[in-house]
């Protein structure tokens, strides 16, 4: 099936049972941004966090992407609210809000000061800023780093939302 999907031009998920379970640094950035957007969607759309899931993709041209979707089959799982936020100005406001949310964590400076471990499974992340219910996260809340978004406390790393 995966060969057929690849031939048809579908992006392949980064996580593959036959591959090591480690994301690249751009994948960690995409994963962290996905979690911020999912949390913001929960506030904006009224979806519960356990009903929103993510999927991280490695595109053939080397770029990273993520998919945010609902996993519920009841009324909470309809795509109407998510589809509405995927269009133009609403999407822009959603992303801006998510990036704004990343600036501060109630566990700082401890959270943002964490050093990346050798397997890059844990870095600047915690239950207050990036962790989601584990049923929502394909990677079980590993490979997350808020510093990829806002930079770190000693400014040795610049995030995408750093001025």
Regions found by a protein language model. Give the residues of each.
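C-terminal accessory domains/tails appended to large, multi-domain proteins
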Residues: 1-163
